[in-house]
């Protein structure tokens, strides 16, 4: 359903599939994402799927480099699934932008460097309400979360519920991409 674009979100696709099949137990999002990956790999081939994943990660890396160029006072982290090298159409990659003096100034600078205008919303967190910029542009599907420079902003825990989350800084994200690229090249 999600893969064929009948449903707009994974939750909607799961609900429709359960309704149609009469299933009472919902599969986990992880199981659904694995199933979606398998469908995509079967459609385009494993190597093409790996190459596409690396290109999406490289687009995020380029965004991180641009952020650190236009706002050198900021520290960036990639969190969640993207921080482990998993990107797909099921949701945005999450990037924490820590220490930005002003989210609007950073966003203006990013737009002056070629990014499209971004929709901005707010997110209720344990630190209060924070600005979130939503980027959907080509290979980029990213939410930028603007956090104050506090200890909690630099720790690998969800700023919403406090649960542990994968988190890598810009250097380790680049290393992750290099490792995935090398693994993809050596394992055709």
Mark where each language-model region is.
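Short coil/turn linker and secondary-structure boundary residues
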Residues: 5-8, 27, 101, 165-171
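Short secondary-structure transition/capping segments
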Residues: 55-61, 118-131, 161-179
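Catalytic cores of NTP-dependent nucleotidyl/adenyl transfer enzymes across multiple folds
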Residues: 146-188
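Helical scaffold of the NTase/Pol beta-like nucleotidyltransferase catalytic core
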Residues: 2-78, 133-138, 143
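Conserved catalytic core of two-metal-ion nucleotidyltransferases
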Residues: 115-151
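Active-site nucleotide-donor binding segment shared across nucleotidyl transfer reactions
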Residues: 61-93, 97-110
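Short, low-complexity, polar/charged sequence segments that are solvent-exposed and flexible
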Residues: 95-99, 114-118, 152-153, 161-166
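A short, terminal or domain-edge coil/loop segment
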Residues: 65-66, 83-85, 126-140, 173-188
